[in-house]
UniProtKB/Swiss-Prot annotation:
PANTHER family, alphabetized: PYRIDOXINE-5'-PHOSPHATE OXIDASE, PYRIDOXINE-5-PHOSPHATE OXIDASE
Protein name: Pyridoxine/pyridoxamine 5'-phosphate oxidase
Pathway in which the depicted protein is active: Cofactor metabolism; pyridoxal 5'-phosphate salvage; pyridoxal 5'-phosphate from pyridoxamine 5'-phosphate: step 1/1; Cofactor metabolism; pyridoxal 5'-phosphate salvage; pyridoxal 5'-phosphate from pyridoxine 5'-phosphate: step 1/1
Cofactor(s) recorded in Swiss-Prot or TrEMBL: FMN
Length: 192
């Protein structure tokens, strides 16, 4: 029985990248408001190390607000073709400006412009308003690198629980739960 859920996650992700043709790094991100209202949305995983799981967002978005107010999150990866899922719970912290700048520089130019143009999660009166904002920002940065907006950054979810689920016939699923206790991972199997 492995005692390193990060290694197990990497192995499962490698298999998912071979089996899943569309977005094997797609994950459901669950956050909650201060009033405990949950909200779930799909995101893309952009990095994973033993320190945690990284994704990027606009701090003005609902998820940005919720993670700043209530800095915990749950991630769920579901790989249908493999009949597997991984659920991760942990604290969410902002990544460094250097990390955010480095990732932002790798994004497609249109995505960089969109980060400046989007007032994410706020009402949009008409699509052409957004397209005009993109055109204006494109003109502003014509011939120049697009810098990262100060409100666009990443979060790292540092897990304290990681559950690996394998689908089995007749709903006799296999579940292994890893829990971080005093800096060490402990694992146990759970009934389906």
């Amino acid at each position: 029985m492995t005692q390193d859920p990060h290694k197990m996650f990497d192995e499962w992700m490698d298999e998912a990248k071979k089996a899943e043709t569309d977005d094997p790094t797609a994950m459901a991100l669950a956050t909650a408001s201060k009033q405990a209202f949950p909200c779930v949305r799909m995101m893309l995983l952009k990095g994973h190390t033993k320190d945690g799981f990284v994704f990027f967002t606009n701090l003005g978005s609902r998820k940005g607000h919720e993670l700043l107010e209530n800095p915990v999150a749950t991630l769920l990866f579901h790989w249908k073709k493999l009949r597997r899922q991984v659920r991760i719970e942990g604290a969410a912290t902002l990544i460094s400006d250097e990390e955010a700048d480095a990732y932002f520089a790798t994004r497609a130019r249109k995505s960089q412009l969109g980060a400046w143009a989007s007032e994410q999660s706020r009402p949009l009166p008409a699509r052409d308003v957004f397209e005009k904002r993109i055109a204006d920002i494109e003109a502003r940065y014509e011939g120049k690198d697009v810098p990262r907006p100060p409100y666009w950054t990443g979060f790292r979810v540092s897990p304290i629980r990681m559950e690996f689920w394998n689908d089995r016939e007749f709903r006799l699923h296999e579940r292994e739960l890893f829990t971080l206790n005093d800096g060490r991972w402990q694992s146990e199997f759970l009934y389906p």
